Protein backbone atom coordinates (compact mmCIF):
# COMPACT_ATOMS: atom_id res chain seq x y z
CA UNK A 1 0.00 0.00 0.00
CA UNK A 2 2.73 2.45 0.95
CA UNK A 3 4.76 1.55 -2.15
CA UNK A 4 1.76 2.18 -4.41
CA UNK A 5 1.14 5.54 -2.73
CA UNK A 6 4.77 6.57 -3.23
CA UNK A 7 4.60 5.60 -6.90
CA UNK A 8 1.49 7.75 -7.39
CA UNK A 9 3.12 10.72 -5.66
CA UNK A 10 6.23 10.33 -7.83
CA UNK A 11 4.12 10.14 -10.97
CA UNK A 12 2.43 13.42 -10.00
CA UNK A 13 5.66 15.14 -8.94
CA UNK A 14 7.56 14.62 -12.21
CA UNK A 15 5.04 16.43 -14.51
CA UNK A 16 4.72 19.27 -11.99
CA UNK A 17 8.50 19.66 -11.93
CA UNK A 18 8.59 19.75 -15.73
CA UNK A 19 5.89 22.45 -15.87
CA UNK A 20 7.62 24.54 -13.19
CA UNK A 21 10.98 24.32 -14.98
CA UNK A 22 9.43 25.41 -18.28
CA UNK A 23 7.75 28.41 -16.66
CA UNK A 24 10.93 29.47 -14.88
CA UNK A 25 12.94 29.33 -18.10
CA UNK A 26 10.37 31.57 -19.77
CA UNK A 27 10.53 34.10 -16.94
CA UNK A 28 14.33 34.20 -16.65
CA UNK A 29 16.06 36.87 -18.77
CA UNK A 30 18.24 35.63 -21.58
CA UNK A 31 21.36 37.15 -19.98
CA UNK A 32 21.08 34.70 -17.05
CA UNK A 33 21.63 31.72 -19.33
CA UNK A 34 25.30 31.35 -20.27
CA UNK A 35 26.13 30.30 -23.82
CA UNK A 36 29.74 29.94 -24.85
CA UNK A 37 31.26 31.49 -27.94
CA UNK A 38 31.37 28.14 -29.71
CA UNK A 39 27.56 27.93 -29.47
CA UNK A 40 26.67 31.60 -29.89
CA UNK A 41 28.94 32.90 -32.66
CA UNK A 42 30.71 29.99 -34.28
CA UNK A 43 27.58 28.33 -35.61
CA UNK A 44 26.20 31.49 -37.20
CA UNK A 45 29.32 33.29 -38.42
CA UNK A 46 29.78 31.69 -41.85
CA UNK A 47 26.00 31.52 -42.41
CA UNK A 48 26.07 35.30 -42.82
CA UNK A 49 27.66 34.76 -46.24
CA UNK A 50 24.31 33.38 -47.43
CA UNK A 51 22.32 36.54 -46.64
CA UNK A 52 20.43 37.72 -49.74
CA UNK A 53 19.81 41.48 -49.88
CA UNK A 54 16.97 43.09 -51.88
CA UNK A 55 17.85 44.46 -55.35
CA UNK A 56 19.22 47.99 -55.41
CA UNK A 57 17.61 50.96 -57.12
CA UNK A 58 19.08 52.33 -60.39
CA UNK A 59 20.81 55.38 -58.88
CA UNK A 60 21.82 53.77 -55.61
CA UNK A 61 25.56 53.27 -54.92
CA UNK A 62 26.82 49.71 -55.10
CA UNK A 63 26.63 47.76 -51.86
CA UNK A 64 30.14 46.64 -50.79
CA UNK A 65 30.75 42.92 -50.50
CA UNK A 66 31.06 41.38 -47.02
CA UNK A 67 33.02 38.19 -46.42
CA UNK A 68 32.71 36.24 -43.17
CA UNK A 69 35.30 33.58 -42.46
CA UNK A 70 36.54 31.75 -39.38
CA UNK A 71 38.68 28.90 -38.15
CA UNK A 72 37.58 26.81 -35.22
CA UNK A 73 39.35 24.75 -32.57
CA UNK A 74 42.81 26.29 -32.90
CA UNK A 75 45.34 24.91 -30.40
CA UNK A 76 46.14 28.36 -29.01
CA UNK A 77 45.07 30.63 -26.18
CA UNK A 78 42.14 32.93 -26.90
CA UNK A 79 43.81 35.75 -24.97
CA UNK A 80 47.01 35.56 -27.00
CA UNK A 81 44.94 35.38 -30.18
CA UNK A 82 42.93 38.44 -29.15
CA UNK A 83 46.00 40.71 -29.11
CA UNK A 84 46.85 39.68 -32.68
CA UNK A 85 43.23 40.04 -33.78
CA UNK A 86 43.08 43.56 -32.36
CA UNK A 87 46.39 44.45 -34.04
CA UNK A 88 45.00 44.14 -37.58
CA UNK A 89 41.51 45.47 -36.90
CA UNK A 90 40.70 48.36 -39.25
CA UNK A 91 43.69 47.77 -41.56
CA UNK A 92 43.63 47.04 -45.27
CA UNK A 93 44.21 43.44 -46.25
CA UNK A 94 47.71 44.09 -47.61
CA UNK A 95 48.77 46.03 -44.52
CA UNK A 96 47.44 43.31 -42.22
CA UNK A 97 49.29 40.58 -44.12
CA UNK A 98 52.50 42.62 -43.94
CA UNK A 99 52.13 43.07 -40.17
CA UNK A 100 51.52 39.36 -39.63
CA UNK A 101 54.39 38.34 -41.90
CA UNK A 102 56.98 39.87 -39.56
CA UNK A 103 55.33 38.79 -36.31
CA UNK A 104 57.04 35.78 -34.74
CA UNK A 105 54.04 34.56 -32.73
CA UNK A 106 52.33 31.29 -33.56
CA UNK A 107 48.90 32.90 -33.84
CA UNK A 108 50.12 35.41 -36.43
CA UNK A 109 50.74 32.69 -39.00
CA UNK A 110 47.33 31.15 -38.28
CA UNK A 111 45.56 34.48 -38.79
CA UNK A 112 47.54 35.06 -41.97
CA UNK A 113 46.32 31.74 -43.38
CA UNK A 114 42.72 32.63 -42.50
CA UNK A 115 43.04 36.04 -44.18
CA UNK A 116 44.42 34.49 -47.36
CA UNK A 117 41.55 32.00 -47.40
CA UNK A 118 39.03 34.83 -46.95
CA UNK A 119 40.72 36.85 -49.71
CA UNK A 120 40.44 33.95 -52.16
CA UNK A 121 36.83 33.43 -51.11
CA UNK A 122 36.06 37.11 -51.81
CA UNK A 123 37.32 36.89 -55.40
CA UNK A 124 35.83 33.47 -56.09
CA UNK A 125 32.41 33.65 -54.42
CA UNK A 126 31.58 37.31 -53.71
CA UNK A 127 32.33 39.00 -57.04
CA UNK A 128 35.17 41.17 -55.70
CA UNK A 129 37.16 42.52 -58.65
CA UNK A 130 40.40 43.55 -56.93
CA UNK A 131 41.68 41.30 -54.15
CA UNK A 132 43.59 44.19 -52.56
CA UNK A 133 40.47 46.36 -52.28
CA UNK A 134 39.46 44.87 -48.93
CA UNK A 135 39.75 45.95 -45.33
CA UNK A 136 39.25 44.15 -42.02
CA UNK A 137 36.03 45.35 -40.46
CA UNK A 138 35.86 42.81 -37.62
CA UNK A 139 38.54 40.60 -36.13
CA UNK A 140 38.10 38.79 -32.86
CA UNK A 141 38.73 35.51 -31.06
CA UNK A 142 36.58 33.28 -28.88
CA UNK A 143 36.90 30.45 -26.39
CA UNK A 144 36.92 26.97 -27.84
CA UNK A 145 37.04 23.53 -26.31
CA UNK A 146 38.85 23.07 -23.01
CA UNK A 147 40.07 19.56 -22.17
CA UNK A 148 41.23 18.58 -18.69
CA UNK A 149 44.08 16.11 -18.44
CA UNK A 150 46.21 14.65 -15.63
CA UNK A 151 49.67 16.06 -15.01
CA UNK A 152 51.77 13.53 -13.10
CA UNK A 153 53.91 14.82 -10.23
CA UNK A 154 56.45 13.17 -8.01
CA UNK A 155 55.69 10.92 -5.03
CA UNK A 156 52.49 9.59 -6.55
CA UNK A 157 50.79 12.98 -6.73
CA UNK A 158 49.11 14.58 -9.70
CA UNK A 159 47.61 17.84 -10.91
CA UNK A 160 45.08 18.96 -13.49
CA UNK A 161 46.23 20.62 -16.71
CA UNK A 162 43.97 22.22 -19.31
CA UNK A 163 44.41 21.93 -23.05
CA UNK A 164 42.71 25.05 -24.38
CA UNK A 165 41.46 25.78 -27.88
CA UNK A 166 40.15 28.98 -29.45
CA UNK A 167 38.21 30.23 -32.47
CA UNK A 168 39.15 33.11 -34.77
CA UNK A 169 36.57 35.19 -36.64
CA UNK A 170 37.18 37.79 -39.35
CA UNK A 171 34.93 39.96 -41.51
CA UNK A 172 36.29 41.54 -44.70
CA UNK A 173 34.49 44.44 -46.39
CA UNK A 174 35.13 45.68 -49.89
CA UNK A 175 36.64 49.15 -50.16
CA UNK A 176 39.31 51.20 -48.39
CA UNK A 177 39.38 51.20 -44.58
CA UNK A 178 37.59 54.05 -42.80
CA UNK A 179 39.58 56.90 -41.37
CA UNK A 180 40.54 56.44 -37.72
CA UNK A 181 38.68 58.60 -35.25
CA UNK A 182 40.57 61.49 -33.71
CA UNK A 183 41.68 60.75 -30.14
CA UNK A 184 39.49 62.38 -27.52
CA UNK A 185 41.11 65.06 -25.41
CA UNK A 186 40.62 65.84 -21.74
CA UNK A 187 38.37 68.75 -22.69
CA UNK A 188 36.05 66.41 -24.61
CA UNK A 189 35.79 64.08 -21.62
CA UNK A 190 35.08 67.04 -19.32
CA UNK A 191 32.31 68.33 -21.61
CA UNK A 192 30.69 64.91 -21.70
CA UNK A 193 30.87 64.64 -17.92
CA UNK A 194 29.28 68.07 -17.43
CA UNK A 195 26.51 67.19 -19.88
CA UNK A 196 25.79 64.01 -17.92
CA UNK A 197 25.54 66.02 -14.71
CA UNK A 198 23.15 68.52 -16.30
CA UNK A 199 20.89 65.82 -17.72
CA UNK A 200 20.41 64.08 -14.37
CA UNK A 201 16.90 63.49 -13.06
CA UNK A 202 16.49 64.54 -9.43
CA UNK A 203 13.35 63.07 -7.89
CA UNK A 204 10.89 64.97 -5.66
CA UNK A 205 11.79 68.32 -7.25
CA UNK A 206 10.15 70.70 -9.67
UniProtKB/Swiss-Prot annotation:
<dbReference type="GO" id="GO:0005762">
    <property type="term" value="C:mitochondrial large ribosomal subunit"/>
</dbReference>
<dbReference type="GO" id="GO:0003735">
    <property type="term" value="F:structural constituent of ribosome"/>
</dbReference>
<keyword id="KW-0689">Ribosomal protein</keyword>
<dbReference type="InterPro" id="IPR036394">
    <property type="entry name" value="Ribosomal_uL22_sf"/>
</dbReference>
<dbReference type="InterPro" id="IPR001063">
    <property type="entry name" value="Ribosomal_uL22"/>
</dbReference>
<dbReference type="Pfam" id="PF00237">
    <property type="entry name" value="Ribosomal_L22"/>
</dbReference>
<dbReference type="GO" id="GO:0006412">
    <property type="term" value="P:translation"/>
</dbReference>
<keyword id="KW-0496">Mitochondrion</keyword>
<dbReference type="GO" id="GO:0005739">
    <property type="term" value="C:mitochondrion"/>
</dbReference>
<protein>
    <recommendedName>
        <fullName>Large ribosomal subunit protein uL22m</fullName>
    </recommendedName>
</protein>
<comment type="subunit">
    <text>Component of the mitochondrial ribosome large subunit (39S) which comprises a 16S rRNA and about 50 distinct proteins.</text>
</comment>
<feature type="transit peptide" description="Mitochondrion">
    <location>
        <begin position="1"/>
        <end position="40"/>
    </location>
</feature>
<keyword id="KW-0687">Ribonucleoprotein</keyword>
<keyword id="KW-0809">Transit peptide</keyword>
<dbReference type="InterPro" id="IPR047867">
    <property type="entry name" value="Ribosomal_uL22_bac/org-type"/>
</dbReference>
<comment type="similarity">
    <text>Belongs to the universal ribosomal protein uL22 family.</text>
</comment>
Amino acid sequence: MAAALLRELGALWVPNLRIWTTQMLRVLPQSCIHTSTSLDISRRWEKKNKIVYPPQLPGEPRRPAEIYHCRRQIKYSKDKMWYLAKLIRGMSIDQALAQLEFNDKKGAQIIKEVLLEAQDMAVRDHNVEFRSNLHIAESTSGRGQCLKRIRYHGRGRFGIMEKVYCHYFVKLVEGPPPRPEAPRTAVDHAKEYIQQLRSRTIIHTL
